[in-house]
């Protein structure tokens, strides 16, 4: 066991690096007195919720305004002096000090990207200082649940330059016996889907998250393709591999109407559209089926589908306990997407997960469309026993890095490892069995 003095924060450094879209992002390194180092890189999103914590960008001509040197400077000039001398084991204090330094509701002074980079790097430094893997440090000795991956194999919306309005069409290989088998199942369907697209003369170019980005007639056509790919790969739709959607409906919502596919829908009509898709396909999860501030629409959707389908709030909740508590109080949605950079610190992320768990809401640990080689969310999914992870398709190294880390964790756990399977989707998952 490391001496407590060895776990004190000695030095904090930061630099500007690139994410998977070639845009700048923040990397932080935390060095402890005993020599242990933690490094973390923050992601960024394309379809960002209006209520997310503020991502600080430089503006100006450099990197077309997307530079993050201000955030880097905040880390080295403001955050580092305040944190050096604190114990890396006291994550809550570290994050609280940064939050107080910023002194805004949305972290707009220092930037959520600067605060989060240091927050995650501190946790990793502490884990390294103790000689523990990150999932074990954050979750304790009982953390052994491997998540079901929600694999985004057809990209649309803000994640691709095609005509699909819905943002993500995902595979859910819940019928596997292990995470390793689930990954194999997803990969086999992914490659079968590529062959199908080629046979139909459709594009096999990939979008931001590594899924294919073909032009298709409709959202239903994407569902038909996935069903065909699942069957041709030798799996049973609904029994072994189901589907999930990220509608990202805020992106096409304006003046009380949902406008896509050449049509305009009221909230009530949008709910019926989604119900029709659920009846047509084995859909176990729908993310952001309604817009981020259409609370009345969300109420209708939850009443209509909430007993049988996981209804995930992403833009709706933005990993924020205040918005999640409103959803809980008003019986809206039944699941929350967890994105560390939406709220901007590890402590607040864990608080959101804890609130969801206490309230019988499922959690889905998620990447962003602008990702990096950082694998923190893989460890976080195991540490928190979330049971579900979204980290893209079966291509692009920044996506596959998280899958590979989960493979390592599963191997390390050995016989202790449990694959979440359908149970990972909570009560609604069991209804699908």
Curated annotation (Swiss-Prot):
Listed GO biological process terms: glycolytic process
Binding positions ((2R)-2-phosphoglycerate): 167, 339, 368-369, 390
Record CDD domains: enolase
Pathway: Carbohydrate degradation; glycolysis; pyruvate from D-glyceraldehyde 3-phosphate: step 4/5
GO CC term, one of those recorded: extracellular region
InterPro entries, per the entry: Enolase, Enolase-like_C_sf, Enolase-like_N, Enolase_C, Enolase_CS, Enolase_N
Binding site for Mg(2+): 246, 287, 314
Cofactor note: Binds a second Mg(2+) ion via substrate during catalysis.
Gene3D superfamilies: Enolase-like C-terminal domain (3.20.20.120), Enolase-like, N-terminal domain (3.30.390.10)
Compartments where located: Cytoplasm; Secreted; Cell surface
Cofactors named for this entry: Mg(2+)
Main location: cytoplasm
E.C. number: 4.2.1.11
Catalytic residues in the record: 209, 339
Keyword annotations from UniProtKB, A to Z: Cytoplasm, Glycolysis, Lyase, Magnesium, Metal-binding, Secreted
SMART domains: Enolase_C (SM01192), Enolase_N (SM01193)
GO molecular function annotation: magnesium ion binding; phosphopyruvate hydratase activity
Catalytic activity annotation: (2R)-2-phosphoglycerate = phosphoenolpyruvate + H2O
Family named by the database record: Belongs to the enolase family.
Its job: Catalyzes the reversible conversion of 2-phosphoglycerate (2-PG) into phosphoenolpyruvate (PEP). It is essential for the degradation of carbohydrates via glycolysis.
Name of the protein in its database record: Enolase
């Amino acid at each position: 066991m490391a001496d407590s003095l060895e776990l004190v924060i000695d030095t904090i450094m930061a630099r500007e690096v690139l994410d998977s879209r070639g845009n700048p992002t923040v990397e932080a390194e935390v060095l402890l007195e005993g020599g242990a180092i933690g490094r973390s890189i923050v992601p960024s999103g394309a379809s960002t919720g209006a209520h997310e914590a503020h991502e600080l960008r430089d503006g100006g001509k450099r990197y077309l305004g997307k530079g993050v040197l201000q955030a880097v400077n905040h880390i080295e000039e403001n955050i580092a002096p305040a944190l050096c001398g604190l114990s890396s084991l006291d994550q809550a204090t570290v994050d609280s000090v940064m939050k107080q330094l910023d002194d805004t509701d949305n972290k707009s002074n220092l930037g959520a990207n600067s605060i989060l980079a240091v927050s995650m790097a501190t946790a990793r430094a502490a884990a390294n200082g103790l000689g523990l893997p990150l999932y074990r440090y954050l979750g304790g000795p009982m953390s052994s649940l491997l998540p079901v991956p929600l694999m985004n194999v057809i990209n649309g919306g803000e994640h691709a330059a095609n005509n699909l309005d819905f943002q993500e069409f995902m595979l859910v290989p819940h019928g596997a016996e292990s995470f390793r088998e689930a990954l194999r199942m997803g990969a086999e369907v992914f490659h079968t889907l590529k062959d199908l697209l080629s046979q139909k003369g459709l594009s096999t170019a990939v979008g931001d998250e590594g899924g294919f980005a073909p032009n298709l007639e409709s959202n239903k056509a994407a569902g038909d393709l996935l069903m065909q790919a699942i069957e041709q790969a030798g799996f049973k739709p609904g029994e072994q591999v189901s589907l999930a959607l990220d509608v990202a409906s805020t992106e096409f919502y304006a003046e009380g109407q949902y406008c896509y596919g050449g049509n305009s829908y009221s909230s009530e009509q949008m709910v019926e559209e989604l119900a029709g898709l659920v009846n047509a396909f084995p859909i176990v999860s729908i993310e952001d089926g309604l817009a981020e501030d259409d609370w009345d629409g969300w109420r209708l959707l939850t009443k209509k589908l909430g007993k049988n389908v996981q209804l995930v709030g992403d833009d709706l909740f933005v990993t924020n306990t205040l918005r999640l508590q409103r959803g809980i109080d008003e019986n809206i949605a039944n699941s929350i997407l967890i994105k560390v950079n939406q709220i901007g610190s590890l402590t607040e992320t864990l608080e959101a997960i804890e609130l969801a768990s206490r309230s019988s809401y499922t959690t889905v640990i998620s990447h962003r469309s602008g990702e990096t080689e950082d694998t923190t969310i893989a460890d976080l999914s195991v540490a928190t026993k979330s049971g579900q992870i979204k980290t893209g398709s079966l291509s692009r190294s920044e996506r596959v890095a998280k899958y590979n880390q989960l493979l390592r964790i599963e191997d390390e756990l050995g016989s202790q490892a449990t694959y979440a399977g359908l149970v990972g989707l909570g009560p609604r998952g069991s209804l699908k069995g």
